[in-house]
Structures are given as structure tokens and as C-alpha cells.
């Protein structure tokens, strides 16, 4: 079997495989749901010996508004807390910030082919998800929990699609 077949089978076995995405820059690109309703990507870039697991998250407009109204000190502390906490997960990340307000963040981690096993794949998927979830918890802690009837969850969190 090929790496692509192995990875797809492992994802399907655990009922997280959603679809294969067209991606001219990748040998394969799978969109997964882990956990249910949380979109993530599993990608093998062309001519690389690595699998990238990633999750992008768009910050809810309500949180953006609350951040925009926060003091500069509160914004800076929040961004510092997000960065230091993400570093504890040993993941890579990119914060998209406009005027000291977090707009979006992308969390990724890699598995090199020589370390690719089903166990390594799912531990990495879980680590990326937990890092994303931690950012959501920090947002809710610092700027309020938006889980009410007037707020719809935002699931615009696919890294590439």
C-alpha cells in the first residue's frame, strides 16, 4: 500500500474521513472531521516527506468586536497568552492579527514519513485540535463565552478549502 492509501484507510477506519480535496500542490489532501463538525486537513505536500495536519479557525465576529473594544493592554496580554500557550503544545501556528485584534489562527503539526503510524497520526490530529480548542477557551475566558441562542457557531476552519 502507498502512504496515501494507508492514511486514507486509517482516517476512514476511525470515521473521520470526509473527502479528498483537489490540491495541485499536494500528493494528497484529505479533509477530515475531528471531532464531529470540526474540519481539519491532512496534507502531503508534493516532493516532501512530511504529512501536515492543520486546522484554521476564523474568530467569531462577536469576539472580534469585544476585542476591538478592549484596552491595548488587554489585547496585548491576550495575544501574548495565546502565543505562549500554543508553544506549550509544541505545534506550529500562525496568528492573523489586524490592529492588535485576532482575526484568524492556523494550527499545524508535521509527521515525517519515517515516523508515520496510525498512532502518530491520531496523536498529532488530537494535539492540533487541543491547541485550537485551547485558543477558543482563552477567547471565551478573556472576552466572554458566546454560547447563547443568538450566536451561531462558526465552523469556517478548513485550512485550505
Predicted ranges, named:
Residues 35, 56-58, 110-112:
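Solvent-exposed residues in well-ordered beta-strands and their adjoining turns
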Residues 70-90, 113-146:
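Ampiphathic alpha-helical segments that act as solvent-exposed interaction surfaces
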Residues 38-69:
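Short, well-structured hydrophobic secondary-structure segments
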Residues 49-53, 100-113:
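Glycine-rich, often proline-containing surface loops adjacent to acidic residues and nearby aromatics
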Residues 57-104:
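Short, internal acidic amphipathic alpha-helical interface segments
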